[in-house]
């Protein structure tokens, strides 16, 4: 049994004793601490927090507790349901919300879940903000809303389409070229939210597809980290022929891996470098990545006349470095 506290939120295994795992009492405690931090530091005025989750078995339970706690803190909750991490980040920004909570343990196994905390721009909290949330949780300096100020609850399932529309509107995305290529792909969405949004995106792009583990039921068919040792199913399928490529995502779709037409991994590091090369060739500029990324990112950035900077591991640290 494990509970890990960090600047980006808390994660742990479900069940067990308070203080040692991700259990209902600690979910309430850290959600309350986050809401307290937002109340003290955000001036959007919307009094609204977005909540999204991946398809983990524990997700509905955790979501119910998070939403109820936020309402108890006087916040109106917009529950966008099963949603990718990038979709939830986008929803915070599009809704002019005060913040957001993503309920996902990313590539960790099914017994794990987590609360990932966002600011009012849909960005992960930086180090200072994350430490303030942890300090508030430790002090338990909480003040819940009275009966006349309890928050409202709404559900909004429109953000998958809004996310897809925003991607297709990017100048760097040549929709017609993709349609004219008549691609056929295999997709492993590991029984989570990739199986909800990716068919909608691929349909818009005119891509023919076969899904493996496409049902978003949280019963992960294999270890959800998108590494070659976990992806023999889709790699073997593509190696038999008939597909242009394979697409693999993790449970909250913030990690992406490609499989080549011969069934071999293209690799996450190569994907990042290839995308950076394409983007910088059209829109030159500087780049930032975390210290665990490949050195090739520096090389491709400098090739296009830009400057590369490295940040500590963590989405909030990368965002801070960009700014």
Show where each model-derived region lies.
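Short, surface-exposed alpha-helical segments at coil->helix boundaries
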Residues: 59-64, 130, 195-199, 298
């Amino acid at each position: 049994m494990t509970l890990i506290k960090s600047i980006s939120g808390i994660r742990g295994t479900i069940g067990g004793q308070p203080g040692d795992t991700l259990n209902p009492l600690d979910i309430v405690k850290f959600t309350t601490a986050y809401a307290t931090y937002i109340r003290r530091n955000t001036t959007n005025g919307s009094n609204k927090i977005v909540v999204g989750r991946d398809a983990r078995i524990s997700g509905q339970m955790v979501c119910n507790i998070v939403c109820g706690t936020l309402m108890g803190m006087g916040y109106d909750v917009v529950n966008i349901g099963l949603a990718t991490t990038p979709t939830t980040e986008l929803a915070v920004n599009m809704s002019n919300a005060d913040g957001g909570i993503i309920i996902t343990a990313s590539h960790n196994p099914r017994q794990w879940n987590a609360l990932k905390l966002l600011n009012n721009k849909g960005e992960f909290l930086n180090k200072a903000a994350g430490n303030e949330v942890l300090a508030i949780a430790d002090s338990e300096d909480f003040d819940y809303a009275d009966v006349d100020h309890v928050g409202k609850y709404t559900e909004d399932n429109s953000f998958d389409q809004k996310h897809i529309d925003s991607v297709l509107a990017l100048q760097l995305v040549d929709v017609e070229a993709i349609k004219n290529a008549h691609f056929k792909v295999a997709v492993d969405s590991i029984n989570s939210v990739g199986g909800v949004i990716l068919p909608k995106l691929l349909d818009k792009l005119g891509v023919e597809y076969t899904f493996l583990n496409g049902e978003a039921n949280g019963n992960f068919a294999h270890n959800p980290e998108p590494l070659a040792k976990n992806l023999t199913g889709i790699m073997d399928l593509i190696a038999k022929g008939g597909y242009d490529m394979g697409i693999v995502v993790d449970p909250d779709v913030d990690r992406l891996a490609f499989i080549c037409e011969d069934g071999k991994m293209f690799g996450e590091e190569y994907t990042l470098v290839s995308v950076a090369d394409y983007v910088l060739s059209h829109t030159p500029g500087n780049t930032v990545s975390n210290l665990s990324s490949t050195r090739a990112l520096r090389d491709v950035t400098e090739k296009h006349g830009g400057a590369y900077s490295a940040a500590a591991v963590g989405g909030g640290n990368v965002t801070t470095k960009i700014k």
